Structures are given as C-alpha cells and as structure tokens.
Amino acid sequence: MGFRVMPMFGTNSANRNAPDYARFADAATAKIDGDRLDLNWVDWDNDRHQEGWLSYMNLGVDSWREWLGGRITDAIQRYGVDAYFLDIAGGWVNNPRADMHEGIRRLVGDLRRAYPRVLCCGEMHYDALLAFIPLYQAFSQWPVRDHVQRYARFFQHLSHPAPGRGSSGVHESGFNHWDAQTLSLRAGIIPTLNV
C-alpha cells in the first residue's frame, strides 16, 4: 500500500521567542485598528491552554513568505517529501500591510514551479484558494459540497479519532469518539487513518 510524507508548516504562525524572529518580525499582523493580532487559539504543548507567544504572520510580506518558502524548500530537497501541509492556510485578516491571499498564492506558485511533483495541501479554505491548492483537510461546507468538491479534495482533520481509544494525537482536541461501524468516515472525504 505504501505511504507518503507530508510535513506540516505554520502558514501564519511564528514564535516571537525564536532566535531568528527578528528576520521576519515586520510580517506580524496587526488588526485594522493597529492592535497586535496573536494566533493564540492553538495549543501546541497539549496543556489545554493557548501559548501566548504566537504572532499571526502575513504571507503577503516578503520576509515571512521567503523565510517560510525556504523552510519548505529545505524539507523538499533534504528529505524528498511528497507534499507539504500549510496549517491554517485559510486564515485571512484584513491587514493593510500586505495582501495575505496574494502572499499565499505567490508562495504556492513559486514552490509549484520549482517542484511540480510536490503537492500542496491546506487546512481550511475559502473559495479563492481552490484555484491553486487542490487538497485540504477539514471540510465543513456540507450544504455546498458538490460545488466545492469540483475544485478540491478533502481528507479527515488531524483531530479525526484514531482507531480504538479515539486519540487525536498531539492535537488540542484530545480524544474523540471512534465509531467502529462507520470507521468515523463521512461521504465525499478521502479515508484517513490518524495514528
């Protein structure tokens, strides 16, 4: 059956305490009123509380897009990965510093030109992303499924329960109910085994 390798990259999250944060700090997002926008709803260390050190980054700003693109390029070249996963790819904020949508489009386009056989996958989506990201996790638009699935495919979210105890691994949701009858699958979604 085989397997494919797809590392995850934080599309719009950066640790303000990281040693090289200053290289791309200008890409930290502010709300339209100027207040700092933190990506503080994610729990990375499984303590059931947000972290407090994540800046919400803007891919429209060259410094962040180039830094993230370099990290993805390094993983592709060093490990020969089959795909790369852009966590929270559908995140968008009306940030006057730069156009977030244009930034993600440029990142994906640059990587596709350099590595045409490496698949881009995103989490979350909005209609304009369907033009250049063909695969997503976390499908939730059931009323318009037939329309959306003409342009992209979807697989189960990272929080999809693993067989047995229903663990979601390191994801902040902890455990979910595993249904042995249906394998916790939904119609139209690529079957996904999370371990």
PLM features per residue range, with description:
Residues M1-F3, G80-D82, P116-V118, I189:
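Short, well-ordered coil/turn segments that N-cap beta-strands
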Residues M1-P7, M100-G103, V108:
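Aromatic-lined substrate-binding rim segments of carbohydrate-active enzymes
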Residues G2, I76-Q77, S184:
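Acidic (Asp/Glu)-rich catalytic clusters
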Residues V5-M8, Y84-L86, C120-G122, P191-L193:
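Hydrophobic faces of well-ordered beta-strands that scaffold small-molecule active sites
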Residues F9-N15, L86-W92, M124-D127:
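Short, solvent-exposed turn/loop segments enriched in Gly/Ser/Thr/Pro and often Arg
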Residues A14-L54, N58-D62, E66, G70, ...:
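Glycan-recognition surfaces
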Residues N17-A22, V93-H101:
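Short, flexible/disordered intra-domain loops and linkers
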Residues N58, W67-R97:
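Active-site groove signature of glycoside hydrolases
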